[in-house]
């Protein structure tokens, strides 16, 4: 049998689960929406972040435990800069920048109720010093915080007997933070594959270790091009789902997030 799972409710609705294994306590939260869907997007963002924090509190955790976030913003390109400013202020007030900035995805999306955004997160609290969690820099891109986006390129969770890497939503961004190959989907996919591959390799993982991925495409007609580029890169059998969603810049057509697990431990934890 697996671990016991405890449901977490907010306003009578299950919005998360809490569970444990031998190494850590986990909290997965999803489907959060703002209290007032008619408020301006900035106020709705504050509401979402507060909901994240209160739900974490119900799980006896806090923002320092968060390793991964997801934000699905309606009309994302119209107010992404504003969203970033609100998130930055919230993270700064909670000391997130002094601890560990989580990996994240921020793409276009929405809820049928019409809010400006919906959100979710994954939090992990190790039970002892045998689990190491750290942000991962990209070998081919600058930190996203350099251009005002509060997320890490990836987060590594190193256990005594295996390693997990959670790669943020990644797009065709240059080392200086500018869009590369604007409006060229094939070139953007190639660049993104190279960036994600380098991230994985920096933690001694490869595409063979990827357990699942989500590819976001701005234009549904580009789905075939995405599949073609992975085949040309000889990345086959990847458990990848392609989703039609807007990307955070007008000239970006593609974004990719992946999770990877290796049965190899990266550190000597003093066991055995």
Regions found by a protein language model. Name each.
Residues 1-272:
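N-terminal presequence-like segments and the immediate start of the first folded domain
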């Amino acid at each position: 049998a697996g671990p016991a799972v405890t449901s977490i409710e907010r306003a009578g609705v299950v919005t998360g689960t809490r569970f444990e294994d031998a190494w850590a306590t986990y909290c997965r939260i999803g489907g959060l929406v703002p209290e007032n869907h008619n408020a301006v997007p900035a106020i709705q963002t504050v509401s979402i972040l507060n909901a994240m924090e209160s739900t974490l509190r119900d799980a006896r955790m806090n923002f320092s435990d968060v390793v991964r976030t997801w934000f699905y913003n309606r009309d994302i390109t119209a107010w992404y800069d504003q969203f970033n400013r609100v998130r930055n202020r919230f993270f700064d007030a909670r000391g997130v920048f002094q601890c560990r900035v989580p990996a994240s995805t921020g793409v276009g999306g929405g809820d049928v109720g019409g809010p400006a955004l919906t959100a979710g997160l994954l939090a992990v609290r190790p039970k002892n010093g045998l689990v190491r969690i750290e942000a991962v820099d990209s070998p081919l891109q600058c930190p996203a915080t350099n251009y005002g986006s509060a997320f890490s390129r990836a987060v590594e969770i190193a256990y005594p007997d295996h390693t997990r890497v959670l790669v943020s939503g990644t797009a065709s961004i240059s080392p200086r933070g500018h869009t590369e190959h604007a409006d060229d989907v094939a070139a953007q996919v190639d660049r993104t594959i190279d960036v994600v591959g380098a991230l994985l390799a920096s933690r001694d993982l490869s595409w063979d270790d990827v357990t699942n991925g989500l590819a976001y495409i701005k234009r549904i007609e580009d789905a075939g091009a995405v599949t073609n580029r992975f085949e040309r890169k000889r990345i086959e059998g990847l458990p990848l789902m392609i989703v039609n969603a807007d990307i955070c810049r007008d000239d970006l057509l593609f974004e990719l997030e992946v999770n990877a697990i290796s049965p190899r431990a990266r550190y000597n934890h003093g066991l055995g």
